Each structure stands twice: as C-alpha cells, then as structure tokens.
C-alpha cells in the first residue's frame, strides 16, 4: 500500500512537472529549472525517504526506494538520486559517527548538498581490501595520494567521499570539498 502511494504520487508529480519538453529544457538550462524540480522533490519527501527517522528521514525501506527509482526511470527523471543521494547518504548513515550522521544527513535531506562516492580504482576490481589510494597526516593536514576513476555524479557534487587506507591498512572515508583549491579533477 505504501509503495502504491509513492508510485502514484511520483507519477502525478512527473506528469505535472516533467513532460518530455520540460525535461529537454532542464537538460539545456543553466540549472535553475533543475533546482526548481529538486525543491519540489524535497517537498514530497523523496530526499528523506531512504534515511532513518532519527536523522530527519522518513525511514523508508528498500522496496519504497526502488518503487520511487522505478518511477524516475519511467519518467526519464534527470536527478542522479542513486549516486548523489542514496549511495553516499547510506555510507554516511552506516559508517560515520552520530554527530556527523546528523549533520550530513540533515544537509542531504533539507539543504542542497550533493555528494558523490569515489570508490572505483584501477586494477582492484572493487575490492575494498585492495585499496591503493592512501591517506596520510602531515603537518596537521590530511592528504590523499592515489588514483580514482569514474566518480558517478561528481560533476554535480559539492563534496566527494573517498575511501583510502592509512599506513596501518585501516580504511578511512575522507570527505573532500569539490570546490577546494586542492581538489584536482580532469573534468
């Protein structure tokens, strides 16, 4: 019953707000139309759907989320929901401490922060135990050294979460600001 409500709500929303012509305008606009669509999506609670209620989410389950994503696909929705909200948000929800969870999930759900997860490395076949990207501390600053590839939705992200290992082989999740002068990208 909940999935039917989600599906009907999303279908009506897209029928009213994302015709084929509107979608093409969004894709060719400078972002204003897209941002308007995101604001409306947030008002419907879609950004809070996958997250626990104690962090301001709606506590939806995987079936709720997949119902919504299926409707996104059927409507040719342009938001990288999985890569800029669901994947990084769930990483934060499961691996960050309580204060950081509250802080970042609130920003994901209510503000306009978009994240990307930078997990792919050459030659490791997605095995987290074979990470080559290193994190190290020097003069009270953290540094990353290594290569990552294919960061989905990075072009729209404010920040990127990067898994890296230290000298003792502990895995760290490092959040870097996409606008930092120290952030280098080949985009």
Where are these regions (language model features)?
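Short alpha-helical functional segments enriched in proximate histidine and acidic residues
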Residues: 13-20, 107, 115-116
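Short secondary-structure junction/hinge motifs that connect adjacent elements
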Residues: 21-43
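Flavin-dependent oxidoreductase catalytic core characteristic
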Residues: 1-18, 136-141, 169
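Glycine-rich beta->alpha junctions and the first turn(s) of the following alpha-helix
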Residues: 1-2, 6, 74, 87, ...
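FAD-binding core of flavoproteins
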Residues: 106-187
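Short, small-residue-enriched loops and turns at beta-alpha junctions
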Residues: 27-28, 56-59, 123-126
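Internal helix-loop-helix
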Residues: 43-111, 153-156
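Buried hydrophobic positions in well-ordered alpha/beta secondary-structure cores of metabolic enzymes
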Residues: 3, 14, 45, 52, ...
């Amino acid at each position: 019953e909940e999935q039917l409500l989600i599906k009907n709500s999303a279908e009506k929303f897209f029928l009213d707000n994302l015709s084929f012509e509107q979608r093409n305008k969004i894709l060719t606009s400078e972002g204003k139309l897209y941002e308007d669509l995101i604001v409306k999506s947030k008002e419907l609670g879609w950004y809070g759907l996958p997250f626990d209620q104690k962090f301001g989410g709606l506590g939806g389950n995987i079936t709720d989320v997949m119902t919504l994503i299926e409707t996104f696909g059927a409507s040719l929705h342009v938001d990288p929901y999985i890569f800029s909200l669901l994947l990084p948000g769930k990483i934060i929800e499961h691996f960050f401490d309580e204060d950081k969870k509250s802080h970042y999930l609130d920003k994901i759900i209510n503000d306009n922060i978009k994240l990307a997860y930078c997990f792919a490395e050459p030659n490791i076949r997605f095995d987290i135990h074979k990470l080559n990207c290193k994190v190290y501390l020097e003069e009270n600053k953290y540094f990353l050294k290594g290569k990552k590839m294919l960061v989905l939705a990075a072009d729209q992200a404010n920040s990127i979460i990067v898994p890296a290992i230290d000298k003792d082989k502990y895995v760290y999740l490092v959040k870097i600001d996409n606008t930092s002068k120290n952030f280098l990208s080949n985009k």
